[in-house]
Regions:
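Membrane-embedded alpha-helical bundles of polytopic integral membrane proteins
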Residues: 1-214
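Hydrophobic side chains within alpha-helical segments
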Residues: 26, 158, 227-230, 253-256
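Transmembrane alpha-helical segments of integral membrane proteins
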Residues: 100, 222-237
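Membrane-embedded alpha-helical segments of transport systems
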Residues: 154-157, 184, 249-259
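Hydrophobic alpha-helical segments of membrane proteins
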Residues: 160, 187-196, 218, 222-229, ...
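Interfacial loop-to-transmembrane junctions
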Residues: 232-255
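Juxtamembrane boundary at the C-terminal end of a transmembrane helix
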Residues: 264-271
Length: 271
């Protein structure tokens, strides 16, 4: 049996997302917000995987030879479920499950914070990265690489320009090291990379690549600032202790916010 495009991405994220959820749970714990890691991990992975699971069920129904009756039954059920109903259903079930796990403490203090923290983890680490899978299902792996290159080049450009020319602080109370010069330099770097990448994608004009790079560069840096906000609130410098990187969340922060923007840009251009 063959598997849908993006299987490698799906399996990689199915491993990485629980690690990121664990780091998010630790950040929330610093603020005395206790969430169920198990509930949030399972829910985040399901929300992230739904486009791939939908495609897998279609392929299984189109080529059922060798599949077990149970697999066919599950694929048939999944195929009848509208995807835009599945994610809200998972989130609602996760909310009930998280509050149910919280009630085992036999305390009411922090129930609303638990609910909010659980949904934050699921949306941030399940729904947002899930946009990369429909992109991969409709485009080549090179498209995913291009998106990540634009986002990460914005990070590197912001760091380099900020170090060389940074004078005016961007948001000193949130991220003292970031400057307006670095912010603009990072966006410009992503725009240049986006224009250059169109050389390998003839279906896009250079100006479309430039606009995509500029927008994804902005989103990537906003994603970095969003994670800085969470870490500042928790009172920590890094989300984890991965040598040389900090934590899994520190690696994912910029690509996460860029994912839905990239998806809708491609929908606008290609339909």
């Amino acid at each position: 049996m063959s598997f849908p495009p993006g299987t490698l991405i799906a399996m990689t994220m199915a491993i990485v997302i629980p690690l990121a959820v664990s780091e998010m749970a630790q950040l929330l714990k610093y603020e005395n917000v206790i969430i169920s890691r198990r509930v949030c991990m399972i829910s985040s992975v399901l929300c992230m995987l739904w486009p791939w699971l939908e495609q897998l069920s279609e392929m299984l129904l189109d080529h059922p030879s060798g599949a077990s009756p149970a697999a066919i039954k599950i694929a048939t059920w999944f195929h009848t479920v509208k995807p835009h109903y599945l994610v809200p259903t998972v989130m609602a079930a996760a909310l009930v499950g998280a509050l149910g796990m919280f009630s085992r403490r036999q305390k009411v203090d922090g129930a609303m914070a638990n609910a909010g923290g659980s949904l934050l983890a699921i949306v941030y680490l399940g729904v947002l990265p899930g946009f990369y899978l429909p992109i991969r299902l409709s485009h080549s792996a090179g498209m995913i690489v291009s998106i990540l290159l634009m986002v990460k080049c914005a990070d590197m450009g912001a760091y380099g320009v900020g170090r060389l020319m940074g004078r005016r602080k961007l948001i000193p109370w949130l991220s003292p090291g970031k400057t307006w010069e670095g912010f603009i330099g990072g966006i410009a770097a992503a725009g240049v990379v986006g224009a250059l990448l169109t050389h390998f994608s003839p279906e896009f004009d250079w100006w479309q690549g430039t606009i995509a790079g500029l927008l994804l560069g902005i989103c990537g840096q906003l994603g970095d600032l969003l994670e800085s906000l969470l870490k500042r609130d928790a009172g920590v410098k890094d989300s984890g202790s991965v040598p040389g990187f900090g934590g899994v969340l520190d690696l994912l922060d910029s690509p996460l916010l860029a994912a839905p923007v990239a998806y809708w840009m491609l929908k606008l251009v290609h339909g």
